[in-house]
């Protein structure tokens, strides 16, 4: 323990947003939304372990800044206690409310350590809630106690994978605390404290005096190196007394602490919060001690109960500090100098003598003024990031308009914990905000759309030195995890202070891909929560002795959090020796396979072309992800959907071009020499597709007085979700070569990485912005190396379905409408807000009050509102955002209005429909004419002489004969397509590009195309479904609860549990007509906008892929034929694919995939054989029967279904029974009943007189006991092998090359559980146990595991994929289905890209929007 000479103050330095944001507040289970409560806590120097009410254990690695998740299989039950142990292997034990105890042996990247997550279960002895756990120091013994007094001893043999448990002691009352040392177990119960000698199995009570009252009084050993006979302990007693006793239970001293408490207890300083932690504090109960632990220095004892925490000094018999009357303290844990406690449902607070992550030496170094030497930080513990007291705020003005932060999401399967704010602890520090404390609303910096459209000339800037700002009291350091700190504006040369176009929102720069917030291997539920908010911004720091802090509590890129430094410097900067870490974050990831650079200290002087930028590479250490749900903090987990500016690849293949070398340890360019773009890919070419340079964050990387370096960090980082997207903030990627510019207009940068959407270059913008000051330019030759064939990789589907999230203006959103330039939101309280589009972020302005419905015309010229209570419709005279507005009464008794650019369609309270025509800016309303309608309507939408309506029964109608000459049209027609698909829309809207959009009651989004006035029903004979459920959770009950809260109409509902109220109201919302129809969908030329009814909405600004599963009936078969199996293979005859179909295990037929409706050919099976599995390639069909026999049918052009079956001689394999087969092009893979994997070259059964090809046995992946491989899946080109195990975990074989066709190692692929896989030549598709389908993105030769999963619409019972990624499936009723897709793009320009081999840069221009 530390010996302390001067007095120390214990306080909370900064809230643990990085930890709390990584744990979802709710999960979705089916239709139910379950609140996640935190229930248990334990900490040490390496990890923070948090138990939850859903049976999920969250483990945060403090060195890697990664959150992992582990769960108990079976029913979800609350975790009541967790206990960490760091010995040779890291272990964590958790106990639940039903008496289950599980031990997880964690994966370590260090050599010789555990490489596979393992779990041991203690079951069958405890039947009641676990209350205490204790480890032996070597991790071989675990003691667990429950609330009925049972104590179980579990012996762990980690090498053998064994865990044996036995009951060793039973007390009459609940166990309160356990501690173990030197073969002695210290037990505290509600009635007494005792010592249990584990060798002699004898018990001795501590002290002879019985307790005067029962209670949760604990005891702990006093740490120290000593033999058993010298052990001493503290035990708390009623009446503020503490015993010190020896190993025989004899009391050596009694500390009576009443006098120490008489003068009061100095409270711990807590970080200021919006709601004080003591809000809801209880009246102070009688003081008493509780559980105890030794802490900080000799003689100091930490004691706590559910109301209070006390830090006591037994030497001086005094209280050091404490927290009293707070109430609801659930769990307390301490490390050497930190106290963590869990309060209430989800508040974890850290109390310490110093900020998180700073060792005292680093702290002292930071405080030295004028220190010009670079601080060498080489260990992970040294500096996860500078904290508050070390951060000086530089910069100038702060604008004070509220901005809502975009948080991007993209479709992916992994909707777990998505937007976790995983920052290194230090990076969470709140910068001190100048003089005086400002209200939160003023701590925002936003840009108006006018600013955003200005030209931005980028130059390196010198920042004037300013004196350190003194720390101010109170709120200046307080921050709330949903707020944004202000961005300092840098002054431009010439002293004209201009705001850099850095909307704070951009800080949360959207990660538009899919978080690989992976579901853990056994995760029973998909947790969907999105908490990432921005906590701050980079501060420009000019003092050489201080560190810059980039503070973002959205999911921060691992790049900033945990990796080694790529160096870069802007031109025109003097070179200097002293250098500091850009973000103050430098983590040494010890021993991990890819991150070797961390092991060598960086030279202090790297030549003029280097500046440090941390950057993260995918950790590909084998087994590093096995069975664990690792959520890297940032891009590696949030794989984007959109190319970063100029090809930012974050996963393992960090490549710019086909010739790029992978940036692995050691492949570093010579220090100081310029690096060709093909060698280093992390270059941000700053540009924006909508016609101006993207916003740049200027990070000052300070030198000593000789100069100042500036690095523009573009925030267009994409990524996102896992279903929930994680915002990656200001991903500071850059290159050795000092340049930052746009590529030539006629080139598009692409990458050899086919699937990784990081790898695609963004076409350059049409901006005329000068780039002359940006330094040396990239030559044409560099770009011309990029092969034209790679341009075809810019397929829209890779960038499709990238959703960004925005915060709404206040309360839940009832209605959302968009025009060309503005978005309008109506909340449940009747507040109407608007914000300009598509600036860097949304700046909400209150427009009106007491509004029930709002409508706007597509151009934005017309704006109508319907008033609350009076139901009168008003038209706005001239739509101005600022200044006075005049409203004209347009029609009384209205409930819903839809506006086209020159008409208004009004549904009235009577259900009648009225029309006003000839409207314009000068004539916003006119005389109303009644239009007959056969059904009462609830919604209507009109645009470009097309009118669609939604009836109260959720049927869709369209109006025929509408034209500019006949605006009222001729007649209503029912939409047959919607009836056929049984679509039940909640709201509909007409969008640009002649589209119609609908949101249904299940939260699915659909569209139709070709909607024009002459053909209002459109071109499609079905709706196309767009995948949104991974980011937008339509929680009807929360939608209705929002209405309740807003209108205060159910005052007594709160007395019942929220879930019950929600259940009662769930149907009420969708079945009864609300006073106003929620309108949750809007489409304009900048994107598709959706609200889920909460105070948030989502926008897809790129293309969207619509899916339709087409029911195919081969000729000669009945439409009701129930197929059981479908398999696609390369056709023996010509280009294209064959489908092999069967209805049972005793039949088989084949048909060409190109003409699947033609008559199938029947294939005769071997007599008496019951087939269990098939695999096929171009020249052979392999079949496996129920006895494990293999039959081969040779296929040829002349006989595409083959002539006869040949039984394969399997005598070489002995008694092995094969259960799964996979055919590549020339290679065969098989799996046996015990999980063994076999490889064979050649698809044909050779003549038995010749040498038979040998089966080579491949060692399967290391698995926990009882888990084995069950199926193998190979790609048609022999390049990939993926396997599934008996727990539905997915693994990939790495290292497969032409020279090494069997590969070299196995890697667990986290993110989802799959019961079937199908491989094309480029990627992998998976079917989940519930029938959902997902695609793996980012699979390449260099990155065989890919990056993230992304779900597609549909639910199937069996599926297959052709070599070219066309999906075929058997649907739930047994129908044969073919997946058809249609891409919706916002501009005609994007559609040209699929026709040209080398698309012009502007073709994809509107795909991207800088947020």
UniProtKB/Swiss-Prot annotation:
Q: Does the keyword Repeat apply?
A: yes
Where are the membrane-spanning stretches?
A: none
Which Pfam families does UniProt cross-reference here?
Beta-prop_HPS5 (PF23756), Hyd_WA (PF06462), Tectonin (PF19193)
What is the protein name for this chain?
Tectonin beta-propeller repeat-containing protein 2
Superkingdom of this entry's organism?
Eukaryota
The residue ranges flagged as biased composition, category Low complexity, are 400-420
Q: Which disease is it linked to?
A: Neuropathy, hereditary sensory and autonomic, 9, with developmental delay: A form of hereditary sensory and autonomic neuropathy, a genetically and clinically heterogeneous group of disorders characterized by degeneration of dorsal root and autonomic ganglion cells, and by sensory and/or autonomic abnormalities. HSAN9 is characterized by global developmental delay and intellectual disability, axial and appendicular hypotonia, dysarthria, and an abnormal gait that is often described as ataxic. Other features may include peripheral neuropathy, hyporeflexia, and autonomic dysfunction.
Q: What residue ranges carry the coiled-coil annotation? A: none
Compositionally biased spans, kind Polar residues: 475-489, 496-542, 608-621, 763-779
Q: Which PANTHER family match?
A: RUBY-EYE2-LIKE PROTEIN, TECTONIN BETA-PROPELLER REPEAT-CONTAINING PROTEIN 2
Entry keyword Disulfide bond: no
> Which tissues and organs express this gene's product?
Detected in skin fibroblast (at protein level).
């Amino acid at each position: 323990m530390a010996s302390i000479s001067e007095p120390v103050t214990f306080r909370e330095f900064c809230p643990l947003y990085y930890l709390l944001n990584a744990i979802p507040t709710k999960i979705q289970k089916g239709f139910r939304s379950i609140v996640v409560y935190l229930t248990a806590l334990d900490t040490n120097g390496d990890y923070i372990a948090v138990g939850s009410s859903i049976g999920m254990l969250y483990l945060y690695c403090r060195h890697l800044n990664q959150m992992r998740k582990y769960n108990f299989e079976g029913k979800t039950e609350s975790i009541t206690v967790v206990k960490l142990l760091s010995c040779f292997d890291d272990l964590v034990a958790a106990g639940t409310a039903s008496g289950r105890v599980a031990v997880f042996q964690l994966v370590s990247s260090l050599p010789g350590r555990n490489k596979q997550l393992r779990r041991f279960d203690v079951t069958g002895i405890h039947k009641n809630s676990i209350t205490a756990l204790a480890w032996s120091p070597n991790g071989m013994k675990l003691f667990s106690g429950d609330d009925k007094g049972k104590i179980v001893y579990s012996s762990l043999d980690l090498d053998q994978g064994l865990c044996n448990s036995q009951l060793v002691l039973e007390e009459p009352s609940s166990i309160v605390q356990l501690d173990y040392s030197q073969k002695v177990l210290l037990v505290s119960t509600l009635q007494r404290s005792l010592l249990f000698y584990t060798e002699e199995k004898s018990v001795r009570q501590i002290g002879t005096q019985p307790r005067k009252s029962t209670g949760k009084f604990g005891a702990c050993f006093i740490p120290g190196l000593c033999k058993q006979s010298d052990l001493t302990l503290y035990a708390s007693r009623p009446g503020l007394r503490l015993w010190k006793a020896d190993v025989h239970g004899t009391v050596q001293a009694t500390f009576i602490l009443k006098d120490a408490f008489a003068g009061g207890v100095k409270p711990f300083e807590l970080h200021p919060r919006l709601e004080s932690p003591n809000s809801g504090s209880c009246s102070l109960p009688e003081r008493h001690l509780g559980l105890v632990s030794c802490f900080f220095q000799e003689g100091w004892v930490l004691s706590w109960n559910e109301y209070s925490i006390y830090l006591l000094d037994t030497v001086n018999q005094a209280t050091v500090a404490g927290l009293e009357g707070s109430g609801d303290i659930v769990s307390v844990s301490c490390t050497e100098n930190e106290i963590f406690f869990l309060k209430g449902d989800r508040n974890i607070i850290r109390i310490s003598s110093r900020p998180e992550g700073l060792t005292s030496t680093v702290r002292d170094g930071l405080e030295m003024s004028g220190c010009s030497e670079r601080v060498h930080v080489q260990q992970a513990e040294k500096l996860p990031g500078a904290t508050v007291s070390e951060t000086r705020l530089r910069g100038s003005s702060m604008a004070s308009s509220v901005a809502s932060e975009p948080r991007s999401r993209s479709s992916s399967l992994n909707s777990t914990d998505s937007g976790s704010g995983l920052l290194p602890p230090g990076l969470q520090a709140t910068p001190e905000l100048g003089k005086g404390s400002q209200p939160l609303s003023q701590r925002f910096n936003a840009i108006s759309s006018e600013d955003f459209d200005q030209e931005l000339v980028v130059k390196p800037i010198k920042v004037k030195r300013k004196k350190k700002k003194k720390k101010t009291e109170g709120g200046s350091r307080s921050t709330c995890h949903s707020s944004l700190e202000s961005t300092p504006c840098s002054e431009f040369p010439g002293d004209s202070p201009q705001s850099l176009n850095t909307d704070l929102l951009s800080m949360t720069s959207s990660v538009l891909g899919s978080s690989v917030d992976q579901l853990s291997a056994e995760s029973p539920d998909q947790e969907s929560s999105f908490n990432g908010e921005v906590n701050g911004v980079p501060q420009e720091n000019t003092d050489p002795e201080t560190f810059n802090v980039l503070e973002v509590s959205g999911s921060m890129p691992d790049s900033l959090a945990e990796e080694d430094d790529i160096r870069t410097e802007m031109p025109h900067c003097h070179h200097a020796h002293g250098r500091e870490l850009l973000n103050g974050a430098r983590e040494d990831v010890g021993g991990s396979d890819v991150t070797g650079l961390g092991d060598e200290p960086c030279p202090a002087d790297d030549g003029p072309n280097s500046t440090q930028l941390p950057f993260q590479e995918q950790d590909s250490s084998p087994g590093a992800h096995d069975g664990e749900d690792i959520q890297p903090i940032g891009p590696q987990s949030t794989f984007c959907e959109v190319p970063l500016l100029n090809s930012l690849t974050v996963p393992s293949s960090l490549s710019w071009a086909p010739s790029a070398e992978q940036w692995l340890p050691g492949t570093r360019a010579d220090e100081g020499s310029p690096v060709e773009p093909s060698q280093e890919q992390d270059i941000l070419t700053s540009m924006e597709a909508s016609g101006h340079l993207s916003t740049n964050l200027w990070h000052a990387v300070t030198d000593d007085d000789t100069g100042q370096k500036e690095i523009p960090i573009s925030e267009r980082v994409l990524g996102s979700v896992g279903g929930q997207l994680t915002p990656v903030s200001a991903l500071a990627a850059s290159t050795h070569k000092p340049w930052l510019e746009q590529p030539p207009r006629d080139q598009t940068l692409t990458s050899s990485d086919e699937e990784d959407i990081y790898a695609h270059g963004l076409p350059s913008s049409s901006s005329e912005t000068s780039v002359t000051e940006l330094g040396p330019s990239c030559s044409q030759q560099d770009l011309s190396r990029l092969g034209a064939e790679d341009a075809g990789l810019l397929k829209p589907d890779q960038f499709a379905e990238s959703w960004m999230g925005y915060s709404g203006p206040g309360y839940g959103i009832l209605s959302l409408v968009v025009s060309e330039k503005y978005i309008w939101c109506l909340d449940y309280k009747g507040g109407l807000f608007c914000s300009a589009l598509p600036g860097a972020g949304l700046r909400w302005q209150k427009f009106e009050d007491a509004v029930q419905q709002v409508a706007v015309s597509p151009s934005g010229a017309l704006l109508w509102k319907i008033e609350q209570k009076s139901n009168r419709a008003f038209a706005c005279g001239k739509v101005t955002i600022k200044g006075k507005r005049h409203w004209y009464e347009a029609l009384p008794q209205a409930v819903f209005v839809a506006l086209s650019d020159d008409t208004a369609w009004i549904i009235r309270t009577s259900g009648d429909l009225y029309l006003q025509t000839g409207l314009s800016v000068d004539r916003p309303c006119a005389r109303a004419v009644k239009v007959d309608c056969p059904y009462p309507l609830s919604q209507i939408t009109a645009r470009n002489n097309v009118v669609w309506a939604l009836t109260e029964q959720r049927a869709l109608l369209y109006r025929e004969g509408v034209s500019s000459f006949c605006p009222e049209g001729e007649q209503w027609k029912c939409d047959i397509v919607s009836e056929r698909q049984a679509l039940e829309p909640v709201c509909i809207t007409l969008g640009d590009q002649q589209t119609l959009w609908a949101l249904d009651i299940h939260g699915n989004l659909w569209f139709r195309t070709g909607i024009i006035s002459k053909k209002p029903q459109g071109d499609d004979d079905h709706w196309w479904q767009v995948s949104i459920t991974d980011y937008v959770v339509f929680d009807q009950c929360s939608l209705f609860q929002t209405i309740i809260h807003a209108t205060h109409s159910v005052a007594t509902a709160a007395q019942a549990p929220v879930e019950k109220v929600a259940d009662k109201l769930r149907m009420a919302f969708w079945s009864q007509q609300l006073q106003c129809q929620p309108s949750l969908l809007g489409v304009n030329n900048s994107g598709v906008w959706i609200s889920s009814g909460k105070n948030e909405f989502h926008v897809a600004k790129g293309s969207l892929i619509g899916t339709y599963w087409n029911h195919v009936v081969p000729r000669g078969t009945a439409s009701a034929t129930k197929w059981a199996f479908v398999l696609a293979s390369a056709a023996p005859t010509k280009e294209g694919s064959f489908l092999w179909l069967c209805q049972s295990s005793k039949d088989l037929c084949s048909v060409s995939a190109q003409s699947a409706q033609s008559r199938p050919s029947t294939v005769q099976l071997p007599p008496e054989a019951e087939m269990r599995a098939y695999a096929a390639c171009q020249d052979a069909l392999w079949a496996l029967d129920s006895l494990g026999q293999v039959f081969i049918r040779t296929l040829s052009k002349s006989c595409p279904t083959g002539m006869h079956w040949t039984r394969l001689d399997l005598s070489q394999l002995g008694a092995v029974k094969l259960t799964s087969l996979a055919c590549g092009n020339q290679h065969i893979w098989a799996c046996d009943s015990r999980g063994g994997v076999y490889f064979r070259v050649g698809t044909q059964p050779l003549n038995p007189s010749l040498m038979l090809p040998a089966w080579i046995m491949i060692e399967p992946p290391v698995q926990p006991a009882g888990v084995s491989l069950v199926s193998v899946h190979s790609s048609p080109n022999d390049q990939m092998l993926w396997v599934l195990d008996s727990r539905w975990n997915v693994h990939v074989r790495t290292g497969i090359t032409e020279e090494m066709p069997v590969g070299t190692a196995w890697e667990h692929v986290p993110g989802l559980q799959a019961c079937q896989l199908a491989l094309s030549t480029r990627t992998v598709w998976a079917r989940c146990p519930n029938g959902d389908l997902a695609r793996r993105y980012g699979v390449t030769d260099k990155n065989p595991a890919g990056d993230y999963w992304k779900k597609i619409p549909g639910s199937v019972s069996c599926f297959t994929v052709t070599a070219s990624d066309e999906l075929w499936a058997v649907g739930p009723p047994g129908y044969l289905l073919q997946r058809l897709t249609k891409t919706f793009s916002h501009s005609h320009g994007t559609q040209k890209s699929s026709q040209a081999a080398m698309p012009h840069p502007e073709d994809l221009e509107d795909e991207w929007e800088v947020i």
